[in-house]
Amino acid sequence: YWRIVPNLRSQIGGPDGFFFGDLRVGLKSELIFARNITLLSSASVGVVDNYDELKLASDSVLPHVRTEIVNYLKESKKFSIERMQLSAFYNPLPNLYAKTSAGYLESMFGGIGGEMLYKPFYKNWSLGAEIWRVKQREYNMRLGFQDYQTTTGFINFNYLCLLYTSDAADDVRCV
């Protein structure tokens, strides 16, 4: 599928002002090459913005990662590729699900990585882990990268609480 969508990017709060943003026209698509292989893409063109007064300069000695948002917003205001991610999905064992992905994973980083999810059938919980090798994208959000790269990962626990209520007004529980 593909679709054309309106898009609003924003930076809310800060010393430069309360709201900075841009209105964009975006193209989103998903190509399904096989039952378990997809390519997600998202690109957009800027229509109007108010980024001229946005500064938010950081003087931190730590690597500037998310604090570089101003550069990403300003240098990608005409055209940007937000995402272009090739993913493969697997079910290697019962109750075990996996995904591997590579590409431009989000507006600031691209890379390669994977996720595993253990979700027992008829249970309301799951346990997952993911690891990614990522590199910081160029500020214009096109095809280039900067020098900064790192490995990141997460462990996730999910619990779906289905509320049960009885006739007693104060009897509400998770089941």
Task: Place the predicted regions along the sequence by residue.
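Outer-membrane pore/translocation modules
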Residues: 1-20, 30-155, 159
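Disulfide-stabilized cysteine-rich extracellular repeat microdomains
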Residues: 46, 170-171
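Conserved small/polar residues in nucleotide/adenosyl-binding loops
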Residues: 164-169
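Predominantly the C-terminal beta-signal and adjacent terminal strand-loop region
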Residues: 173-175
